[in-house]
From Swiss-Prot:
PANTHER family: CHAPERONE PROTEIN DNAJ, DNAJ HOMOLOG 1, MITOCHONDRIAL-RELATED. GO terms for biological process: chaperone cofactor-dependent protein refolding; DNA replication; protein refolding; response to heat. Zn(2+) 1 binds at residues 154, 157, 211, 214. The grpE-dnaJ-PG1777-PG1778-PG1779 genes are co-transcribed and may form an operon. SUPFAM superfamilies: Chaperone J-domain (SSF46565), DnaJ/Hsp40 cysteine-rich domain (SSF57938), HSP40/DnaJ peptide-binding domain (SSF49493). This is Chaperone protein DnaJ. It comes from the Bacteria. Binds 2 Zn(2+) ions per monomer.
Amino acid sequence: MAEKRDYYEVLGVSKNATDDELKKAYRKKAIQYHPDKNPGDKEAEEHFKEVAEAYDVLSDPQKRSQYDQFGHAGLGGAAGGGFSGGGMSMEDIFSRFGDLFGGFGGFGGFSDMGGGSRRRVRRGSDLRVRVKLSLADISKGVEKKVKVKKQVVCSKCRGDGTEEANGKTTCQTCHGTGVVTRVSNTFLGAMQTQSTCPTCHGEGEIITKPCSKCKGEGVEIGEEVISFHIPAGVAEGMQMSVNGKGNAAPRGGVNGDLIVVIAEEPDPNLIRNGNDLIYNLLISVPLAIKGGSVEVPTIDGRAKIRIEAGTQPGKMLRLRNKGLPSVNGYGMGDQLVNVNVYIPESIDAKDEQAIAAMENSDSFKPTDAARKDIDKKYREMLD
């Protein structure tokens, strides 16, 4: 599966599917491709991982929101995250979602995958970083690197948490399963419930000789430089995940994610409005009267535009496709040039004579039609 399919397509649901619809769709697909049902079938195993990856994203509100905004790019797939990219093993999938198979012909547990154990796989906490982007970065997309201080696998025990190879013993409370079973009598008959073992906290083992460096936690504080791609068109406050680049989990669990929060740097010339960019152009009175050409800054450099003779203050010119791309890859914004006329606060004697001559010219006297046009524009603004 060289190219990732749409997650909604993988599960066979619509983009407004509810949590219950997602769960039902995942159960159906997972049972169809379950390794117990398709022994030795590598293609079925890949489909099984694919539906698990899709459900992992769509069942998490934050990840689903990121996916809906950015697609696969917003989940940090290029940085090595996800199931098929090596982020989670088959055992991790069963541990995380195994309870969803209950009542379906015995699927669930670990069956042939893990010797009947249901030990809990811990997950490391997520990290958050704020990344500042210029409009130029946002217009094209950009590769970024951040250096973070985080929990990493202990360099001495390699995450095992023990001082030596035989530093663990099987938990006597749950006998290594990670869960305890309780049977209670009710008016409906005997009811069996399972819960995480309180002694080993779901790990199935007790550390008897903890690592002297990490004190048995399996993690230590370290630093890592993380690279990731930010797609074009992102906006202030948007978030994306880099899978598996958060804190390491204690004793061999699954890493958390790195949550990248987008921050826009103010541009000295351009103002963003959605996918459009606005430039406030100030022209002289003679240019507004006679017309002419002028250069304006754009996201790609400078562009020459034509000012028509008699241009009024507040006129908006549009440069097609000179704005920002849509974050989902469809469509491009425009650049709007808001034309304003500069009125000097003071003038010299020579200019006063020129203006005095203008005052007596009918060309410079406001017309009733011009006043009505301004009135119309204000009414449209108020509606």
